[in-house]
């Protein structure tokens, strides 16, 4: 058996951490006196960088904006990050791992952080639905193959 064939696929989470966090309620306390019928916008973005041989940082940026009419009730942004060891894969498989699999791991942490921040701002509970990062990644690949060249930024 050759050495190339003996390379096994391996994946390990080394660390998950909150890299950046922000919560703003620019119209507080007046916003608390209004009827709560917000328009909620969810923005997602992912980025990855190689830290060492077979070690990558993946950052999932989640921004939630709640608006009442033209006014922003709150704006919450979390950058949830992870350091992952990924061995034995490359090319499209590696891109999928860093662009979909790792964000799937990070999203529940970001969602919990956002829910906590919104609650601490004394706004009604915010439940973010699960995100299908596999589908978003496939859409990104399709856009790339069609020559759009868009950055891997998704609005949900």
UniProtKB/Swiss-Prot annotation:
UniProt cross-references to InterPro entries, sorted A to Z: SecB (IPR003708), SecB-like_sf (IPR035958)
Domain of life: Bacteria
Listed HAMAP family: SecB
Description of how the protein assembles with itself and partners: Homotetramer, a dimer of dimers. One homotetramer interacts with 1 SecA dimer.
Organism: Serratia proteamaculans (strain 568)
One protein family per Pfam: SecB
MF terms in GO: unfolded protein binding
Cell location: Cytoplasm
Descriptive protein name: Protein-export protein SecB
Gene: secB
């Amino acid at each position: 058996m050759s050495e190339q064939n003996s390379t096994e696929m391996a994946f390990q989470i080394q660390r998950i951490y909150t890299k950046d966090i922000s919560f703003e309620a620019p119209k507080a306390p007046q916003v608390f006196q209004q009827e709560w019928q917000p328009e909620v916008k969810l923005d997602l973005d992912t980025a990855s960088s190689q830290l060492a041989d077979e070690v990558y940082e993946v950052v999932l940026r989640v921004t939630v904006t709640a608006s009442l009419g033209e006014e922003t009730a709150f704006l919450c942004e979390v950058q949830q990050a992870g350091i992952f060891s990924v061995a034995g894969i490359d090319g499209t498989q590696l891109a999928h791992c860093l662009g979909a699999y790792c964000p799937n791991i990070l999203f529940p942490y970001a969602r919990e952080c956002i829910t906590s921040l919104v609650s601490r701002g004394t706004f009604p509970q915010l439940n973010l639905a699960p995100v299908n990062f596999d589908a978003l990644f496939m859409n990104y690949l399709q856009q790339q193959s069609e020559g759009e060249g868009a950055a891997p930024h998704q609005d949900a």
